[in-house]
Amino acid sequence: MDFLHRNGVLIIQHLQKDYRAYYTFLNFMSNVGDPRNIFFIYFPLCFQFNQTVGTKMIWVAVIGDWLNLIFKWILFGHRPYWWVQETQIYPNHSSPCLEQFPTTCETGPGSPSGHAMGASCVWYVMVTAALSHTVCGMDKFSITLHRLTWSFLWSVFWLIQISVCISRVFIATHFPHQVILGVIGGMLVAEAFEHTPGIQTASLGTYLKTNLFLFLFAVGFYLLLRVLNIDLLWSVPIAKKWCANPDWIHIDTTPFAGLVRNLGVLFGLGFAINSEMFLLSCRGGNNYTLSFRLLCALTSLTILQLYHFLQIPTHEEHLFYVLSFCKSASIPLTVVAFIPYSVHMLMKQSGKKSQ
């Protein structure tokens, strides 16, 4: 691993030296790959226009991030910004100098990259969904158009993945091999769900059982390794030790914070899809109109941006996890049930008044 790490540091130094002027763009691309944006941006847009794609996106994102956590616990991957300080391979304490940024100091293990895995997951789902839509009703005349669309969409996919990967390497939070593993892992998870149609008809019980399994497996795995005297939170004190600015350390980057966030979202989706509000909005005649979907999408994006103003207290870790679960569960409840139902009732009332 020292070979990969040492050469990875050289790549990071090259990027930071020669591409420093592109920091704003690279920081933006890092945010594009942020797993949290799946729930705040990609999901509300996709679900309001195509419920099948939106539902699949949540399952892919949650299972993908859960697998990412398990692999991080198994692989014990270092992050560049602390590895250069901890390693003994550099003689006479001549550790390379890596610049740190406000988004550098993530506290969990580094391999595979969660941002790269999350970005490849959701964009794979969106690209394959768009391509399957273009195939429907295709005749000989449109075969050329389909091929052009295929080439364009996959080019966009890889452009985004490469940009996200470079951005994560640039800020010294990942080594190159870690982002490559993330992209491959995300695509494999997304492809697996292309052959899992059962999630579209999953009952509330299925959602609850899945949630319980993911939680118990993760906690059980953590406790088992603790019994074996293996600390899975080993990276947190190292991150705090070598982060250039203590204010850049955030509790929501710890391994369990991501687990709680994902379980909350899946829990909320299960309740929302099986709720009376969602079923009533689906039965409405407006559900399939473009105006209804646009209004739901815009309202969802607007309301979810307000969630960023809901600051969860971080002084008590257990309280933070509970509130984070509740906040995450409310996202699909808002997008899937509350907003479509409210828009449906408003359009229904306005329709009665116009008659």
UniProtKB/Swiss-Prot annotation:
Q: How is it modified after translation?
A: N-glycosylated; the non-glycosylated form is more unstable and is degraded through the proteasome.
Q: Main role? A: May hydrolyze glucose-6-phosphate to glucose in the endoplasmic reticulum. May be responsible for glucose production through glycogenolysis and gluconeogenesis.
* Known catalytic reactions: D-glucose 6-phosphate + H2O = D-glucose + phosphate
**Where do we find the motif Prevents secretion from ER here?**
352-355
**Pathway field:** Carbohydrate biosynthesis; gluconeogenesis
Q: What class of enzyme is it?
A: hydrolase
Q: What is this protein called?
A: Glucose-6-phosphatase 2
**Active-site residues, as the UniProt record annotates them:** H115 (proton donor), H174 (nucleophile)
Q: Where in the cell is it found?
A: Endoplasmic reticulum membrane
User: Which family does the similarity line name?
Assistant: Belongs to the glucose-6-phosphatase family.
Q: Which residues lie on this side of the membrane: Cytoplasmic?
A: 46-56, 137-146, 190-211, 283-293, 340-355
Q: What is its EC number?
A: 3.1.3.9
